[in-house]
Swiss-Prot record:
SUPFAM superfamilies: L28p-like. Zn(2+) binds at C16, C18, C36, C39. GO terms for cellular component: ribonucleoprotein complex; ribosome. It comes from Thermotoga maritima (strain ATCC 43589 / DSM 3109 / JCM 10099 / NBRC 100826 / MSB8). It holds the Pfam family Ribosomal_L31. It comes from the Bacteria. Part of the 50S ribosomal subunit. This is Large ribosomal subunit protein bL31. GO terms for biological process: translation. Binds 1 zinc ion per subunit. The keyword RNA-binding applies.
């Protein structure tokens, strides 16, 4: 490996919108996420199986207003 060209890795706390915090090694200083394994329906649904939709930006509602619920 060439010296002096690689970014410095550091331990960073990643903060989720649900309040959970995870620690990772990364080159980025600050990371904020919308969904993590503590709040994502895939991990929290308890194996119910249905359709899981995570919509934090209102895209599903915009689609339903435009095309209706029967699409």
């Amino acid at each position: 490996m060439k010296k002096g060209i690689h970014p410095e890795m550091k331990l960073v706390t990643v903060k989720c919108a649900c309040g959970a915090e995870h620690t990772f090694y990364t080159t980025v200083d600050n990371i904020r996420i919308d969904v993590c394994s503590n709040c994502h329906p895939f991990y929290t649904s308890g194996g119910k199986g249905g359709v899981l939709i995570v919509d934090t930006e209102g895209r599903v509602e915009k689609f339903r207003r435009k095309y209706g619920d029967n699409y």
